């Protein structure tokens, strides 16, 4: 591709887990017409194709394209309109959820679905169909997209809606990891709010059985947001004990008078950026156990506590580049969900993780609600768990066995987190994958949109 017409830089790219790096040509532009011409040129030249990349917070290889072209989207970041009456925002795909939150809050609007970080673009949120603490009440991000402009392989920009004439392409793009085309712009329906704060309740459980029982008693319906940190290191009976945080956006009259003076103030500071100095091996059982014990004891039980966005939702966003704490070898975030009825099988997986010798401190437990229409959307009703394993010998073999178990129990892995499962396993986990591939090939028969993940999982 001509570097005169399309000035690119050669970069080594990897996911947030800092594993499986590859080198690609990267084009960054704020002009959507340049993106259209670059994709058209890539289609004409063949080769390794092109993929869009947002802020690089996917943990695996879905936004990498070794030997090909990567469109760096964050420069395309205009907010075109915010309508507090209809609750609709019209934004470029490179707008981050952090940027959108700051712009929308003065209008009394809240991002409808937030993952564990705000450092995600709108395009990435759609492409991965991200979910958050409110999945049981609001579903995933794609549920709130009212339209999008999708650049397809032939250079056409198509206007897509969830129930329009091209609804199959809309839903194939939701969760499609950028492989149906490049999302240039989207309209999102936001959530109305009176404040930028939460009213939160905290609870602790003493064992895995207690944690599961707590999430099975129906009380989740009383809260908009819910998730838990759980102990994956201690032996039974402490294994699976949890610090559970649940809450809803605060009403104005629920705030103390001091906060009522500026209830929509964006209150989520970043304290520091971690330097890249941490040695491999520092993240281990002996550092994780005391941190976990401190976190569990500090959490405690509380009611009706007013918390800001950082306290309730995004503690890790206080630390820029926090993934550096795992050292240059990186880490694997393993996220899976199994159906609600597979509860005994789910418990056996947690026991096996504890016994494996691969230890994780940053563990998330969430009971998902219903999924949506997207063939490759990750959430299904069931037990969802995220664990962060430092990279070390034997990990690949262990998680390969976990893959087998998750599949056997009717579960699946999340493309935004995966960088190593096989095509055979992935295809078996997603029963509608043939439907998705048919739709993708109908708009991109030559595989112009391609990524390291797409080649690994045979999605082209």
UniProtKB/Swiss-Prot annotation:
Catalytic activity, reaction form: trans,octa-cis-decaprenylphospho-beta-D-ribofuranose + FAD + H(+) = trans,octa-cis-decaprenylphospho-beta-D-erythro-pentofuranosid-2-ulose + FADH2
Positions with a binding annotation for FAD: 52-62, 116, 121-124, 128-131, 183, 414
Cell location: Periplasm
GO cellular component, one term: periplasmic space
Keyword Oxidoreductase in record: yes
Top-level enzyme category: oxidoreductase
GO molecular function: D-arabinono-1,4-lactone oxidase activity; FAD binding; L-gulono-1,4-lactone dehydrogenase activity
Pfam families referenced in this protein's UniProt entry, alphabetically: ALO, FAD_binding_4
Keywords, sorted A to Z: Antibiotic resistance, Cell wall biogenesis/degradation, FAD, Flavoprotein, Nucleotide-binding, Oxidoreductase, Periplasm
Gene Ontology biological-process entries: capsule polysaccharide biosynthetic process; cell wall organization; response to antibiotic
PANTHER family listed in its UniProt record: D-ARABINONO-1,4-LACTONE OXIDASE, L-GULONOLACTONE OXIDASE
Subunit structure: Monomer. Interacts with DprE2 to form an epimerase complex.
Protein's name in the database: Decaprenylphosphoryl-beta-D-ribose oxidase
UniProt lineage: Bacteria, Bacillati, Actinomycetota, Actinomycetes, Mycobacteriales
């Amino acid at each position: 591709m001509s570097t005169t017409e399309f000035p690119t830089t050669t970069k080594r790219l990897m996911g947030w887990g800092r594993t499986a790096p590859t080198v690609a040509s990267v084009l960054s532009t704020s002009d959507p017409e340049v993106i259209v011409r670059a994709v058209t040129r890539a289609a004409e030249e063949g080769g390794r194709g092109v993929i869009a990349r947002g802020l690089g917070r996917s943990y695996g290889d879905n936004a990498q394209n070794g030997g090909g072209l990567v469109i760096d989207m964050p420069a395309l970041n205009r907010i075109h309109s915010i309508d507090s009456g209809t609750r609709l925002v019209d934004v470029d795909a490179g707008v981050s959820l952090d940027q959108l939150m700051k712009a929308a809050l003065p209008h009394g609007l809240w991002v409808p679905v937030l993952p564990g970080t705000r450092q995600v673009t709108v395009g990435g949120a759609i492409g991965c169909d991200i979910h958050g603490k409110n999945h049981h009440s609001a579903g995933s991000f794609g549920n709130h997209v009212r339209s999008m402009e999708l650049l397809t392989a032939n250079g056409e920009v198509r206007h897509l809606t969830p129930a329009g004439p091209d609804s199959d392409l809309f839903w194939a793009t939701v969760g499609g990891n950028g492989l149906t085309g490049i999302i240039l712009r989207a309209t999102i329906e936001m959530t109305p709010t009176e404040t930028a704060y939460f009213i939160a309740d905290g609870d602790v459980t003493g064992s895995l059985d207690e944690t599961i029982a707590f999430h099975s008693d129906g009380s989740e319906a009383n809260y908009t947001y819910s998730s838990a940190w759980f102990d994956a290191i201690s032996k039974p009976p402490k294994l699976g004990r949890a610090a559970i945080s649940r809450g809803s956006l605060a009403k104005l009259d629920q705030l103390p008078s001091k906060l009522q003076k500026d209830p929509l103030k964006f209150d989520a500071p970043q304290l520091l950026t971690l330097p890249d100095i941490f040695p491999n091996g520092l993240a281990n059982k002996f550092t994780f156990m005391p941190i976990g014990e401190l976190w569990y004891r500090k959490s405690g039980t509380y009611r009706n506590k007013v918390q800001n966005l950082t306290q309730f939702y995004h503690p890790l966003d206080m630390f820029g580049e926090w993934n550096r704490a795992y050292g240059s070898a990186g880490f694997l975030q393993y996220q899976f969900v199994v159906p609600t009825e597979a509860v005994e099988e789910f418990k056996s997986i947690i026991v096996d993780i504890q016994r494996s010798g691969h230890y994780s401190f940053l563990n998330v437990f969430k009971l998902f609600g219903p999924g949506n229409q997207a063939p490759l959307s990750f959430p299904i009703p069931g037990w969802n768990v995220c664990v962060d394993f430092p990279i070390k010998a034997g990990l690949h073999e262990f998680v390969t066995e976990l893959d087998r178990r998750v599949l056997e129990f009717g579960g699946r892995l999340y493309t935004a987190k995966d960088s190593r499962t096989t095509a055979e396993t992935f295809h078996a986990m997603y029963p509608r994958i043939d439907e998705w591939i048919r739709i993708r090939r109908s708009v991109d028969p030559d595989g112009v949109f391609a990524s390291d993940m797409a080649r690994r999982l045979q999605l082209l």
